Amino acid sequence: MNRSSIRNFAIIAHIDHGKSTLADRLIESCDALAERDMKEQVLDSMDIERERGITIKAQTVRLKYTSKAGEVYYLNLVDTPGHVDFSYEVSRSLAACEGSLLVIDSSQGVEAQTLANVYKAIENNHEIITVLNKVDLVSADPEKVKSQVETIIGLDASDALLVSAKTGIGINDVLEAIIERLPAPEGDEEAPLKAVLVDSWYDPYLGIVILVRIKDGVLKKGMKICMMSTGAVYTVDNVGVFTPHKKMVDALSVGEIGFITAGIKELLACKVGDTVTEDARRCAEALPGFRATCPVVFCSLFPVDAGSFEHLREALGKLQLNDASFTFDIESSTALGYGFRCGFLGMLHLEVVQERLEREFDLDLTATAPSVVYKVTDKRNVTRDIHNPNDLPEAHEILKVEEPWIMATIMVPDQYLGSMLALCNGKRGERVDLSYTGNMALLQYRLPLAEIVFDFYDRLKSISKGYASFDWQMDGYMPAEVSKLTFLINSELVDALACIIHKSKIESRGREICERLKDLIPRQQYKIAIQAAVGSKIVARETISPYRKDVTAKVYGRDVTRKMKLLEKQKKGKKRLRSIGNITVPQSAFIQALQVKD
């Protein structure tokens, strides 16, 4: 295939600005699917994506387009996620393309994730086409949004395209702009094969499938390929592209994006960002690959049925193949048995992974409270990362603790600014900058990551009636005054409930969690004490009163000694029950107890 007829582009936008709908219209305009196969969010293959109305996995499709001049072009479209938790998917997709369609809702304007994604595209030296979507809405104001694009982002918006992905207005203009304004891929077809591994996933019929972008050379069926990071050699069984259905081809050449299968059995053999080359004629050096992302939120997942442990391990391995930003390690808990300590890029990422495990692999799971990574330096001046609250050393062994901070960018209508400032200040935030564009305020705040993990995003949306948008980047570590808050049920330590809390919130958080546990744990025939402790100091306590059988009901008259005898016997029985009885804490109680609202 002549590379001058190829265009590789990604669609980037803030969440809910119409990326997937625009992708649907482009597919429809190029007749890539029969009318009976067209449906909304055609590239969103997971049920979770359709239900939540979001894109989680970046998807590719090759479109064949005949221009107004009568020339045939092959367009490789990548529909990317919009949520901040899936920014790694976006960066990987952008590395495989030469240009981007920046989609902006013409009624909402530029939002926080719009900024984050466009900066990623600029880092990848992309040619950017600005597309103002939803121009058919009564509330649309394209001129105002053009002004925002120029003042906030710094892009020339004079040639921005006005589009309605829902009704199809302006779709042909987008297709023409792609072939006229985006560059063709560069590369040498005669050079040794050099391809970057963009994604991988497990297919029940084909085994491990890898998605590649060809930088140099040609990748053919039957060729022996080598993974440059491991040196492993495989023979290519199948070569294909998505149209959006799988379509087998004989070869992929410079600039093309497609998939291959090569009988790969080892999950760890497919490292995203790895360079694929021909074994017989290897390229001189590997491609730079992608900048690895580190998980920032950690949570433990335990199977409700202990016999499902191996099934969970296998499921996590298959998910990690498809999501390189997700990590997991084995851990054990006295309360919950064996499970895995998992790392995620954010709370939505955590929710999606847990939901996928439960749906796709039919697992019943218990999740503990999410926590962030603390850097702890002990008295011997040794620093280590603490992912699990139970690994935090005793207070007398610690020299200092540092917690992760983020730089948050918040865009909010000015009428909600006061409430937004109060929210950020209440989360121990430090204001960095405040500027205005029309009636929108652009806030920059430094915040501790631990403060935004649970409910910050929900409260931000609630305060602003849904109009505020939020994006964040890691911004280093700062000294922190934190302690480990532990919980005891009838004097037994429950390790699954331990959490690391800022010292200013220990008592209030301990009290709230104890109250929540009191409501969640079923009553027994004896009294249950729920205590929150820091070290040996009890900071909060709640008591679940027992069921009481009226043992004196059968005693007639005024036989006080008989009544006292029966009550004493009941007391001894309850004491014996309490000493041998195990409290059964419902699985749902662990996560519900720790999701405390401020």
Swiss-Prot record:
SUPFAM superfamilies, per database record: EF-G C-terminal domain-like, P-loop containing nucleoside triphosphate hydrolases, Translation proteins
Gene3D superfamilies: 3.30.70.240, Elongation factor 4, C-terminal domain, Elongation Factor G (Translational Gtpase), domain 3, P-loop containing nucleotide triphosphate hydrolases, Translation factors
Catalytic reaction annotation: GTP + H2O = GDP + phosphate + H(+)
Top EC class, one word: hydrolase
EC identifiers of the protein: 3.6.5.n1
A GO-annotated cellular component: plasma membrane
Keywords: Cell inner membrane, Cell membrane, GTP-binding, Hydrolase, Membrane, Nucleotide-binding, Protein biosynthesis
Taxonomy, superkingdom: Bacteria
Primary location class: membrane
UniProt: GTP binding residues: 16-21, 133-136
HAMAP family, alphabetized: LepA
Function: Required for accurate and efficient protein synthesis under certain stress conditions. May act as a fidelity factor of the translation reaction, by catalyzing a one-codon backward translocation of tRNAs on improperly translocated ribosomes. Back-translocation proceeds from a post-translocation (POST) complex to a pre-translocation (PRE) complex, thus giving elongation factor G a second chance to translocate the tRNAs correctly. Binds to ribosomes in a GTP-dependent manner.
NCBIfam families assigned to the protein according to its UniProt record, in alphabetical order: lepA, small_GTP
Protein name, entry field: Elongation factor 4
Species in which this protein is naturally found: Anaplasma phagocytophilum (strain HZ)
